[in-house]
């Protein structure tokens, strides 16, 4: 029997909800068994309540129905619990007990204990579906506004200008989608100044043309929104969103934010949200479009043209970097650029920066060095120096260079021109101490005559006067325009010449006043002077350095008796030529002394030779230069110098007889020609 009861119950549970039904206790109308617990789940269609009534009730009576009972539950809550015997109070009705619930589900539970002293027949009950007024029968109304009941259900409706949400219960206001595009206007909450609707979300947008920002102006008294709760949360709120900026949420009585809001954007979204509770009068504000301003600086270290108090959309300025700063784009640098105030309030080309000019590493100079500056940016300082003691700065004050605004290293005197280290002239590394004449004089070191040049063919001498110029006698080079020369060696033995520097002539310049004649018949040595430009500069050092040129003042006119130095590898009283350098001191002599000497050729007297003011007579008996010394320097001390310094007063030219007096070309008379020739031919010749 229990199996049959269970199957019938499962079949009843799985059945569709019915409008009515019967419930009987086990074995009804016979006595119900002991130790029974049975339940019935009643369900009627949605939209209906349940009316449950008993027509027979005969259950063991106990206090609080503790032994046997029939219990009625709805939604987990007990609606009633019955036991004992009951009869109808109305003679015209068989109903002894009834229950009515507004829900469509109900549970009936019958329980009996282990023994009954009497025979109890249980209960008979019936249920029917009854209409429920959902609008009034519940504590909370299911609709936010209007509730409409019908048999088996209800529906919600809304006032005019409201719409029903998707949940079909709550009403809201259709306040989204409005777009304001005028440059000035007013926006208000729905129904303002009457209470705004509940359960609403209003989305408005102000969209102005590019280049204008939306400026919101609010009065405090025009704002009244449900205030924040104890946790600071706004149940109803107003929010402004412009780009990635958010202003708000705002709520309360009186606007709590700034009364003027500059959004920096031409688009402003307005979001107003409300819940179902308290409603206030809402809000209103005015707005206007203001040209979007750009900041008053595009980049640092610059100035602007034109200068204005405020820059707005479409304004164009020229940005010029301050002195010492530049704009670097790739590998190209410039000092100015143009920038336009854009619609987003930002300057075009705002990524360009005026950076300090970088002059780069200072260029090296020949025969000198430059300090490595700490950095090479604008304002940095570096210093040049020359290789001492053989070179010095050609221009005093040209040592210090500063990184200038144009990106060049600049000196106050030379500008961007690099300093020049020129050879120190006239100072031998070892002073000459001998007193002997060269004709049979003493062996000396090249360090005492570092300007001495050896001409290999014809065997002769010359004087180094600059790193690329040799001064010699015209008769030395008139027959050989490509002479082979050496400097820096005391010995002219072929194997020893390698210790010095070989010089290559690039071009020979003979004085235009020199008359070319057969050497054996020559009687006129006037203007016996020539210049040789070297192909490559000579490196100076202790054995190689130039001799100074004479000045143009009268101090450089040698007086009779003044001593000078001569050097060379020419003939001596015992040898036709020597291989080791010899040097001597000899005095300046009156010119008539040279004219009185008889020559080695008895057929030609000295009276037939030409004597001019371009010649110096020097030497004496046993004190003279000779064959092989031609072109060498007759060196004298520079006047008024504390440190001994030598200049080339004369060049070995000719003499009637070796070992007596000799004739020297007076170099002072040719200074203009020398300097002019050197200046005009400073650049390498082009073949």
From Swiss-Prot:
It comes from Sus scrofa. One of its GO terms (cellular component) is extracellular space. The iron and 2-oxoglutarate dependent 3-hydroxylation of aspartate and asparagine is (R) stereospecific within EGF domains. Its EC number is 3.4.21.42. The modification (3R)-3-hydroxyasparagine is found at residue 149. Gene3D superfamilies: Complement Module, domain 1, Laminin, Spermadhesin, CUB domain, Trypsin-like serine proteases. Disulfide bonds join 65-83, 135-147, 143-156, 158-171, 175-202, 234-251, 294-341, 321-354, 359-403, 386-421, 425-548, 594-617, 626-658. InterPro entries: CUB_dom (IPR000859), EGF-like_Ca-bd_dom (IPR001881), EGF-like_dom (IPR000742), EGF-type_Asp/Asn_hydroxyl_site (IPR000152), EGF_Ca-bd_CS (IPR018097), Pept_S1A_C1r/C1S/mannan-bd (IPR024175), Peptidase_S1_PA (IPR009003), Peptidase_S1_PA_chymotrypsin (IPR043504). C1 is a calcium-dependent trimolecular complex of C1q, C1r and C1s in the molar ration of 1:2:2. Activated C1s is an disulfide-linked heterodimer of a heavy chain and a light chain. It comes from the Eukaryota. Residues 16-130, 175-290 form the CUB domain. Keywords: Calcium, Complement pathway, Disulfide bond, EGF-like domain, Glycoprotein, Hydrolase, Hydroxylation, Immunity, Innate immunity, Metal-binding, Protease, Repeat, Serine protease, Signal, Sushi. This is Complement C1s subcomponent. Residues 131-172 form the EGF-like domain. Pfam families: CUB (PF00431), FXa_inhibition (PF14670), Sushi (PF00084), Trypsin (PF00089). C1s B chain is a serine protease that combines with C1q and C1r to form C1, the first component of the classical pathway of the complement system. C1r activates C1s so that it can, in turn, activate C2 and C4. Also cleaves IGFBP5 and thereby inhibits the trophic effects of IGF1. The active site is at 475 (charge relay system), 528 (charge relay system), 630 (charge relay system).
């Amino acid at each position: 029997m229990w199996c049959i009861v269970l199957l019938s119950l499962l079949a009843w549970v799985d059945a569709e909800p019915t409008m009515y039904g019967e419930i009987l206790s086990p074995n009804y109308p016979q006595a119900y068994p002991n130790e029974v617990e049975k339940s019935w789940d009643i369900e009627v269609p949605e939209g209906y309540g349940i009316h449950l009534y008993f027509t027979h009730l005969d259950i063991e009576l106990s206090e609080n129905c503790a032994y046997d009972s029939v219990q009625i539950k709805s939604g987990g809550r007990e609606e009633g619990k019955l036991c004992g015997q009951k009869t109808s109070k109305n003679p015209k009705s068989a109903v002894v007990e009834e229950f009515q619930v507004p829900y469509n589900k109900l549970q009936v539970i019958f329980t009996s204990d282990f023994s009954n002293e009497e025979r109890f027949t249980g209960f008979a009950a019936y249920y029917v579906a009854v209409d429920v007024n959902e609008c009034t029968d519940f504590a909370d109304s299911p609709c936010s506004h209007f509730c409409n009941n019908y048999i088996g259900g209800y529906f919600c409706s809304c006032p005019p200008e409201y719409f029903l949400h998707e949940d079909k219960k709550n009403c809201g206001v259709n306040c989204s989608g409005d777009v304001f595009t005028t440059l000035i206007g007013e926006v208000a909450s729905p129904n303002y100044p009457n209470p705004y609707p509940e359960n609403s979300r209003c989305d408005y947008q102000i969209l102005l043309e590019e280049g204008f920002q939306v400026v919101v102006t609010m009065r405090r008294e025009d704002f009244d929104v449900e205030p924040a709760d104890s946790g600071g949360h706004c149940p109803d709120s107003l929010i402004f969103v412009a780009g990635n900026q958010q202003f708000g949420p705002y709520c309360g009585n009186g606007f709590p934010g700034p009364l003027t809001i500059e959004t920096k954007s031409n688009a402003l979204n307005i979001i107003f949200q409300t819940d179902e509770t308290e409603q206030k009068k809402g809000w209103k504000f005015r707005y206007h479009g203001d040209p979007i301003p750009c900041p008053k600086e595009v980049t640092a270290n610059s100035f602007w043209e034109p200068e204005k108090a405020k820059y707005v959309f479409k304004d164009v300025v020229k940005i010029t970097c301050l002195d010492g700063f530049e704009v670097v784009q790739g590998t190209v640098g410039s000092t100015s650029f143009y920038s336009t105030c854009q619609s987003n309030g930002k300057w075009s080309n705002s990524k360009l920066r005026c950076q300090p000019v970088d002059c780069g590493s200072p260029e090296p100079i020949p025969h000198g060095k430059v300090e490595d500056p700490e950095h090479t940016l604008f304002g940095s300082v570096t210093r040049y120096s020359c290789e001492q003691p053989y070179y010095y700065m050609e221009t005093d004050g040209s040592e210090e260079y500063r990184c200038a605004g144009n990106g060049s290293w600049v000196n106050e005197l030379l500008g961007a021109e690099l300093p020049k280290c020129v050879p120190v002239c006239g100072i031998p590394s070892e002073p000459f101490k001998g007193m002997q004449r060269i004709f049979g004089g003493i062996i000396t070191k090249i360090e005492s005559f570092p300007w001495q040049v050896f001409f290999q063919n014809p065997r002769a001498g010359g004087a180094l006067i600059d790193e690329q110029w040799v001064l010699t006698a015209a008769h030395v080079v008139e027959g050989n325009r490509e002479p082979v020369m050496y400097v820096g060696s005391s010995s002219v033995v072929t194997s020893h010449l390698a210790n010095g520097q070989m010089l290559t002539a690039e071009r020979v310049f003979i004085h235009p006043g020199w008359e070319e004649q057969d050497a054996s018949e020559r009687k006129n040595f006037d203007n016996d002077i020539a210049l040789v430009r070297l192909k490559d500069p000579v490196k100076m050092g202790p054995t190689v350095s130039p001799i100074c040129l004479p000045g143009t003042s009268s101090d450089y006119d040698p007086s009779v008796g003044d001593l000078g130095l001569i050097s060379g590898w020419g003939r001596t009283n015992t040898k036709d030529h020597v291989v080791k350098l010899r040097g001597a001191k000899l005095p300046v002599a009156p010119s008539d002394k040279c004219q009185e000497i008889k020559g080695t050729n008895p057929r030609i007297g000295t009276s037939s030779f030409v004597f001019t003011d371009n010649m110096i007579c020097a030497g004496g008996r046993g004190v003279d230069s000779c064959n092989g010394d031609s072109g060498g320097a007759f060196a004298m001390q520079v006047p008024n110098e504390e440190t001994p310094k030598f200049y080339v007063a004369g060049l070995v030219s000719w003499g009637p007889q070796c070992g007596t007096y000799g004739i020297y070309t007076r170099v002072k008379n040719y200074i203009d020609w020398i300097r002019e020739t050197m200046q005009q031919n400073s650049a390498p010749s082009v073949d």
